[in-house]
């Protein structure tokens, strides 16, 4: 999607430190990287995304089990097109270059008849603003280069009024002719083609008359800034030309219609959408539509500009493409502003994905192309009776037929059941509202506040050296935020866990961003080497501020004092994420029907690059992160998505050692397919891993004995020598790595557990969510065990780190799924309040609400509509697993119970030795 590029220098905003008071202080001594560590150079940091993948030949979409679906809204990402460098020419002999100041003096001192201003810019630019009294003369590049197309021929193709003015002025001796376009920094050896071509033709035209031809060096934009009084933005060149030639009466124009052709410009509306050779000349009582302070409308015609229809290039003059209907001042460039916001776009993307799923689930369709029919036969059209429903809604209907209503009510919340019955377009429009709210939030609230905060980089060339700045500070054990404290939402508070008034937060329609919800993007905009993508920046109020104990770096001046060092030291592209915490009224009598797991705080961040591995581990140490969820492969289609930060090495003073790796193969959903078949090919999830349907294996990849039906849970560790090589890993499996971090001359060890889901593509989804839910199960097991063994106190809020490639789409999707599963009690309470308030026209959707909250803390959480729909799929799959836990339902032939249930998956996790040893090792870190 994006590469790390240099970004323009923008003044950052620095609020009160968003780091908790008791965060771990990381100071790393200066060491040389080992052979596995990245080269610490500016060149490598800027080219960290162009490594070649050993799997570059792998297909974009693999039709294995859990095959990913890669869709970016309605279309795939567009590769940048090649744009050749603009051709420049030497300044013509007999022509001079003048500055903007000199042109300003000429306009102010010389009379108008002694000055001729020629605007050679394209008509779309000329139509917006011009230098007063300019005449627009623009030729195609082919005619500019053609020497036999002289200035006399150019005059013959202009309008009669323009011809009259130009001929009368060109007959005057000592005429000052100034040619300008939008090109800046024109020199003796570098002149733009339009200025060169027109100047050359003017110098050779009528050499008997003395004239001075000059080219504006700085271009029109700079002159507009220096002399705004000489700029006209309300008229076009027909109005700029003095009325030396009286306008012909309407009758004369109509009588000479056979010698004229319509001339496109922007003052008179077209009489009909069809081609009409009649010139409609408005009277003097025109409305305000002739006042053009913005770009002109294309549906207009100049009333007094007839041109000869015999001219071969008459149709090329003043042509302009349709301008946008609205001129939105975009303060920040992001996908929602660049892409179409119509509902049809979202529906089209959803339909394409679901059509792919239906094709994949149809075994007969995959066997041969002979089944293809166009158009579809009548029988297939009659069967398609669920056009107004999404795929997960159809699966829910089939699921509800297999279970009693009481059982479903005890597992599936009421709000989720209601969402299963609403029309497809209403659910899709929820995501459209989310995009609209984020677009409004960014365009309205993004500001850089230059007056309040100043940031001056005196020596940009010293930036790469600043990345290696180190100090030897004492590292303190991490402490965790107290969730019982009532916290006010502010720019200085990264933890969004205040007791909130929920009336205005129950639906997207009632969302209104207050001043406390304003987003600021400042820090990191200028740090291109620390950002993986050029349009993903952290919000200032929730960004993670690193604490390395560094002194202010050389060459940096701050308008405020801070103990966190400079922006080069404390910056990482990461944000804190957390849902608001609501208090349940004491006299409230409702009881929740679903279980609730431990709440956590998330750190959403981009995948590390070679230049940011040290910052990545510093973030983990500062916040006491025990668990990292990695949702991306290291390479996709030959493009690096994540640097292998788990490789052993010395990363600027932080030593990384890979202790152990487990490969968790996902169980098959073949038996699930049989048990969830309803009517007409409607399985709950039919795409699964082929092989054993009852085993959840934990091994390395050479174990292919999957035909037995025993529950053999072998805990086979991959050797340390093989840990660095992931080429043979099964992409459908979950990888668990135990990593040891040491720092300060190996005096302070810190263990970290990484869970990696490799088969989730960028900007895409999975056909089978079992690997996502199993990763969440591992997370829950670790957090619950740490609480049970008193690693955390009951009032502490653990922090986990989640990353994909950009830290937005897949990261936001998983954080939303986990937050819904962890906050059933809160959402059931909010639903009851929603019913009390009686919002008949509004929809209570905790999923959309959660995404909206997260998008106020980090940009573009859940990037596209298919990831949004995938969240509902995952929740339905979770409820399906829970239903199997509480029922004794058997297969249709009365055989054994389906072994794939939530309890079966959790049981396999509890037997993993790597998790048990990790918790034991974490408890040993407490005395530090």
From Swiss-Prot:
Enzyme Commission code? 3.1.3.48
Swiss-Prot/TrEMBL keywords = Cytoplasm, Hydrolase, Phosphoprotein, Protein phosphatase
Quaternary structure annotation from Swiss-Prot or TrEMBL: Interacts with HOG1.
Q: What else is known?
A: Present with 768 molecules/cell in log phase SD medium.
Active-site residue numbers: 804 (phosphocysteine intermediate)
Which EC main class describes this enzyme?
hydrolase
- Name of the protein in its database record: Tyrosine-protein phosphatase 3
